[in-house]
UniProtKB/Swiss-Prot annotation:
Region feature (RNA-binding and homodimerization): 1-73
Similarity-based family: Belongs to the influenza A viruses NS1 family.
Listed GO CC annotations: host cell cytoplasm; host cell nucleus
Coiled coil segments of this chain: none
Keyword Magnesium: no
MF annotations from Gene Ontology: protein serine/threonine kinase inhibitor activity; RNA binding
Motif (Nuclear export signal): 132-141
Post-translational modification: Upon interferon induction, ISGylated via host HERC5; this results in the impairment of NS1 interaction with RNA targets due to its inability to form homodimers and to interact with host EIF2AK2/PKR.
Assembly description: Homodimer. Interacts with host TRIM25 (via coiled coil); this interaction specifically inhibits TRIM25 multimerization and TRIM25-mediated RIGI CARD ubiquitination. Interacts with human EIF2AK2/PKR, CPSF4, IVNS1ABP and PABPN1.
Location(s) in or outside the cell: Host nucleus; Host cytoplasm
Protein name: Non-structural protein 1
One matching Pfam family: Flu_NS1
GO BP, one annotated term: symbiont-mediated suppression of host mRNA processing
Amino acid sequence: MDSNTVSSFQVDCFLWHVRKRFADQELGDAPFLDRLRRDQKSLRGRGNTLGLDIETATRAGKQIVERILEEESDEALKMPASRYLTDMTLEEMSRDWSMLIPKQKVAGSLCIKMDQAIMDKNIILKANFSVIFDRLETLILLRAFTEEGAIVGEISPLPSLPGHTDEDVKNAIRVLIGGLEWNDNTVRVSEILQRFAWRSSDEDGRPPLPPNQKRKMARTIESEV
């Protein structure tokens, strides 16, 4: 087993414990508590996969964190500022669009829309989002454009359900791509989106989705709309 995998799990367990102590003092807000619950489920799953006891891992994680803090200066403890990256122009972000055969799905706190009437087109996904630690922090808006510039799909956060992770965005992108490719469209991810939010792509920015997976995703959209 990779040592980095183990130590990462140990640190995550300890940091979750610190956040839990914070929540026990009734200091956490609703999004904080929601993330705490989701992360608890994730840690249990990772612990089962790795065959590691969470309590033991938490103690080991505490030692790692304490060792790091002893070596850190106050300057190093400052939180890096997030960066706002733009694929789309203001006009592309604000433009109204309509769908001939509308399909919509809510995945967590993200809303996925696409026009199932679009066939045999070359499509590119572009997005505006913030980045921290070289990873997507917050998605502002993602849209799918044809070569002619028409908008044929979109992923946007739901105002009523704030908070999403880069994995949430990846999953939503998979669903959008699967739905569009069901109609024999060719979907490509922009370079900036590929770099920070979609790292499992090939050189053309096309995600490695086998045909059976694409069909499964498209059927999922059909059944849930």
